[in-house]
Regions:
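ABC-family P-loop ATPase nucleotide-binding domain
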Residues: 1-28, 239-246
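ABC family nucleotide-binding domain
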Residues: 18-225, 229
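H-loop (His-switch) and adjacent beta-strand-loop-beta switch element
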Residues: 226-242
Length: 246
């Protein structure tokens, strides 16, 4: 059996301009023996999509997510956000795009332990500097309440369960009304019940809030319930399958 990577044509995105595009994106890790983390990635993700990125360990899932989220730069190729070529931006412009266009949720919540939940959710809004203090507090409180944490806003992260902390991370990711949420193994450190709750929360972000969610996951059962699954092997896309489960 051949080990050649098949050429995969990504599904056509409905709409005018895709939210996120990758054109021939390759990321080489330099060293004595250079390593390709991802290679020749071509994809388009549109509005209101719920996308899984799957594959075995070391296949490049997180590397691809970080490139799409401007947390890393490709060695070659281009990443576009809503038609804007981020390769033509300086770091200040890319940071602004990360802050306004994207939200992030990771396997470990990265909440600041000395801050209350309210203050943690306000952090992206403070960095952007568009809202008054009272408006930031109101929005943070509304986000936490919408995720079932209205009675916990003045608690600190260590007073919550793992699933509750991930809810706070989702609220923080939504703080600046991004177009897309990028999630790296958001249920990876949770038990099955908490994993299901976080999954349903992310699905609600798509179906109720109209956002796009792209999530790296090892959980095949969760990936099967998403709109689309992008499968990686050895840093390349081997399948890009629409699940038609909207």
């Amino acid at each position: 059996m051949s080990d050649a990577i098949p050429q995969v044509v990504p599904p056509q995105v409905v709409g005018t301009v895709p939210l996120i595009e990758a054109h021939s994106v390759t990321r080489i890790l330099p060293g004595v023996v250079p390593t390709a983390l991802v290679r020749d990635i071509n994809l388009k993700v549109g509005e209101n999509e719920f996308v899984a990125i799957t594959g075995p360990s070391g296949s490049g899932k997180s590397s691809l997510l970080y490139l799409l989220g401007l947390l890393d730069l490709p060695t070659s190729g281009e990443v576009l956000l809503h038609g804007r070529n981020t390769m033509h931006m300086d770091e200040h412009e890319r940071a602004f795009m990360r802050l306004t266009f994207l939200g992030f949720v990771f396997q470990f919540h990265f909440l600041l332990p000395e801050f209350t939940l309210l203050d943690n959710v306000m952090l992206p809004m403070r960095a952007l500097g568009r809202l008054s203090q009272s408006a930031m507090r109101q929005r943070a409180g509304e986000l936490l309440a919408s995720l079932g944490l209205a009675d916990h806003v003045h608690k600190r992260p260590d007073q919550l369960s793992g699933g509750q902390r991930q809810r706070v991370a989702v609220a923080r990711a939504l703080a600046n009304e991004p177009a897309a949420i990028l999630a790296d193994e958001p249920t990876g450190s949770l038990d099955s019940q908490a994993s299901e709750q976080v999954f349903e929360m992310l699905r609600d972000v798509v179906e109720t809030r109209g956002k796009t969610v792209i999530a790296v996951t090892h959980d095949a059962a969760l990936a099967d319930r998403m709109h689309r699954e992008i499968k990686l092997r050895d840093g390349a896309i081997i399948d890009d399958e629409a699940q038609l489960r909207r």
